[in-house]
């Protein structure tokens, strides 16, 4: 059978919910025709479980391998760049690889905003706030085309990293620093799960609201204007307390966010930095249980391997200006290919 027949069989099997057969047929099609993009796309879909289910590490790795083949054949497929980035960062925890992935995407699609936003988000999660701010600021400086939804996300993320970047460098938790004060804070809070934002809101807002309602009911006149004024006062209090709850949530749960960053660091590097007493704590288990299945499987392999972070380890970020060099190279190549009459 030809590649096209296997491809059609894969589509039929996928429509029937037989993902194993679909993957087998799609793989057969790509063996016969390694440049069959549609077959590779079906293979990606067949490797991953149905919507709403989490993939295993093996499924995520197989899908990622196929995605890499697709973008190698057609670098303009932003949807596949996005899927590959999400598989790396969200499902497998490969944050450092995801940074290089998105910079590679930007070399091929320099006018797209998505790679910059994704890199900034990853850098912020890693605690590299200054780098994240530079990436986001470049969107505004270069006057890139941004949709309304993307602009809101960019603006919110930019405000977040601007505030975080104002911290002193020693205050920003870096998991690879053994004697950072963040480890002390983690040990102090590791016996309890993090406090939820809704609980903070209820504990702070409800007593104040009850007191205000009692006072308004006692001293306000029974009229429509009084009802409107009372409603406005209550609404303002709720909005203020919601904002305060978000701020207190960040402050009270800073040790939990630090531990999350340390766990992400281990997943990204493959080295262990968390001590055993922290790894068996309530806080660690709470965070671990809320990670994707594939992420947990990969982390367990890293823990079993038990390779400690080397003393000479250094964070190596991609060259964030490589897309400019690539654009210059492409421009020079086009110029060289022009006929002499056109050059004149």
Model-predicted segments: where are they?
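Residue-level recognition of tetratricopeptide repeat
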Residues: 2, 36, 77, 112, ...
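Alpha-helical segment of the N-proximal tetratricopeptide repeat
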Residues: 1-32, 42, 48-56
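Structural signature of tandem alpha-helical TPR/SEL1-like repeats
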Residues: 16-25, 51-66, 92-104, 127-135
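Charged, low-complexity cytosol-facing tails and large interhelical loops of integral membrane proteins
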Residues: 2-9, 33, 261-344
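Alpha-helical linker/edge segments of TPR/alpha-solenoid repeat scaffolds
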Residues: 50-57, 93-94, 129-134, 158-190
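Transmembrane alpha-helical hairpins and terminal membrane-anchor modules
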Residues: 192-265
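TPR alpha-solenoid repeat register
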Residues: 5, 39, 80, 115, ...
